[in-house]
Curated annotation (Swiss-Prot):
Provenance organism: Cutibacterium acnes (strain DSM 16379 / KPA171202)
Purpose: Catalyzes the attachment of serine to tRNA(Ser). Is also able to aminoacylate tRNA(Sec) with serine, to form the misacylated tRNA L-seryl-tRNA(Sec), which will be further converted into selenocysteinyl-tRNA(Sec).
Any one of the GO CC terms: cytoplasm
Protein name: Serine--tRNA ligase
Pfam families reported for this sequence: Seryl_tRNA_N, tRNA-synt_2b
Catalysis: reaction(s): tRNA(Ser) + L-serine + ATP = L-seryl-tRNA(Ser) + AMP + diphosphate + H(+); tRNA(Sec) + L-serine + ATP = L-seryl-tRNA(Sec) + AMP + diphosphate + H(+)
Region spans: Disordered: 1-27
Origin organism lineage: Bacteria, Bacillati, Actinomycetota, Actinomycetes, Propionibacteriales
Alphabetized Gene3D superfamilies for the sequence: Bira Bifunctional Protein, Domain 2, Serine-tRNA synthetase, tRNA binding domain
Domain topic, free-text comment: Consists of two distinct domains, a catalytic core and a N-terminal extension that is involved in tRNA binding.
Family: Belongs to the class-II aminoacyl-tRNA synthetase family. Type-1 seryl-tRNA synthetase subfamily.
Length: 424
């Protein structure tokens, strides 16, 4: 949720942000009106409550007719106070619900536009020239099946479309990537976590995933719980309703978890292989920090992602995501796109978002510093989305004989193997 003070002091900034997101900016007027009504209702209740307290003191000193009159007023005012309290609570709830529809305030400098208007910040590495090497690259599924690493047929048999099984060396690759990612994250000062994949509605709503992204999450109605699409949800809720001391910050967590996505609206897209699936495992970084340090931490998270991708020798680009494609919670987002040889284009493999104080306000996560208790900032970043990184490894490091070369950084976690050989 955005800072209510900003709605009062600079509603035009909120309108500009909504417009930049491609959203209806007129809703800001509704939120401002609801805020005014809320404050008026709260003031009315507090004023009458103060009068009620004052009556108690006067009754203690009064006698005779005056005391009887005051007692009569006390009975009357009790009902009025209760009514005003109810009205204040209802006005506050209405404001909160409306305010939660507003996206985070877009940071100055974010490219304007929609999904296709992101700006490339940099390009790292050079795609291989397979033609010069004398062979046509195979796609990840053909390679994976030959290596005995991916079984789509049985994954579909077990669970339906967009499911898979990593077998043999495919499973070993995931374990190796997990160990490499966790090793690097530990060097960067992150605390490893294995959080729940099932969360309460408050956690999902607090992170902003029940707004625009609601159709993409799995819900278990009998349990009133959600399957997470990213461990960002559990990591953000980890400190919900807490006050952290400034001396504790920044807090850095890195989690390994399964991720579940309905992929609503993706019918017909990336139907072959494991690029777009309903379940995958992911290593996710999460940071709690002081608001004034959030932009610097965003750049650090991006640098960690770049370090990991570079270690795997995958050519990639960094995209500064456009304002209309940020999602509800992010004020700025950087995506890394890895080179996919058989598609002759870059595809998304990581994402890091600066959510400023947006999620912290919704989850009541604050810090205690010299200026009192205030919301802190939260940031998240993908370190390794397993299926997509495995795709990138298979396609970018395939050899003419059907084998796959293992990047040097990954070899210690695969028993020192330099190549993976086909089994069929």
């Amino acid at each position: 949720m955005i800072d209510p003070k900003l709605l009062r002091t600079d509603p035009d900034a909120v309108r500009r942000s909504q417009a930049a997101r491609g959203e209806d900016s007129s809703v800001v007027d509704d939120v401002v009106a609801a805020d005014e009504a809320r404050r008026e209702a709260i003031a009315a209740h507090e004023n009458l409550r103060a009068e009620q307290k004052g009556l108690g003191k006067r009754i203690a000193k009064a006698s005779g007719d005056e005391k009887a009159e005051l007692l009569s007023r006390t009975k009357t005012i009790s009902g009025e106070v209760a009514d005003l309290k109810k009205a204040a609570d209802e006005a506050d709830a209405k404001f909160t619900e409306l305010a939660k529809t507003l996206g985070n305030i877009v940071i100055d400098g974010v490219p304007a536009g929609g999904e296709d208007e992101g700006v490339i910040k940099e390009t790292v590495g050079t795609p291989r020239d397979f033609a010069a090497e004398g062979f046509e690259p195979k796609d990840h599924l053909e390679i994976g099946e030959a290596l005995g690493a991916i079984d789509m047929e049985r994954g579909t048999k077990i669970s339906g479309s967009r499911f898979y099984v990593l077998t043999g060396v495919g499973a070993q690759l995931e374990f190796a990537l997990l160990n490499l990612a966790m090793s690097k994250a530990a060097q960067w000062g992150f605390t490893p976590m294995i959080p729940p994949a099932l969360v309460k509605p408050s956690a999902m709503e607090g992170t902003g995933f029940l707004g625009q992204a609601a159709d993409d999450v799995y819900y278990l109605p009998k349990d009133d719980q959600y399957l997470v699409g990213t461990s960002e949800v559990a990591l953000a809720a980890f400190h919900s309703d807490e006050i952290l001391d400034d001396a504790e910050l920044p807090k850095r967590y890195v989690a390994f978890s399964p991720c579940y996505r309905r992929e609503a609206g993706s019918y017909g897209k990336d139907t072959r292989g494991i690029f777009r699936v309903h379940w995958f495992d992911k290593v996710e970084m999460f940071v709690y920090c002081l608001p004034q340090e959030a932009e610097a931490w965003h750049e650090k998270l991006l640098s960690f992602e770049k370090d990991f991708i570079t270690a795997l020798q995958i050519p990639f680009q960094v995209l500064d995501v456009a304002s209309g494609d940020l999602g509800l919670s992010a004020a700025r987002k950087f995506d890394c796109y890895g080179w996919l040889p058989t598609q002759n284009r870059y595809r998304e493999i990581t994402s890091t978002s600066n959510c400023t104080t947006f999620q912290a306000r919704r989850l009541s996560i604050r810090h205690r510093g010299p200026d009192g208790v205030e919301p802190l900032a939260t940031l998240n970043g993908t370190l390794c989305a397993m299926t997509r990184i495995i795709i990138m490894l298979l396609e970018n490091h395939q050899q003419a004989d059907g084998s796959v070369r293992i990047p040097e950084a990954l070899r210690p976690y695969l028993g020192g193997r330099e190549f993976i050989e086909p089994v069929k």
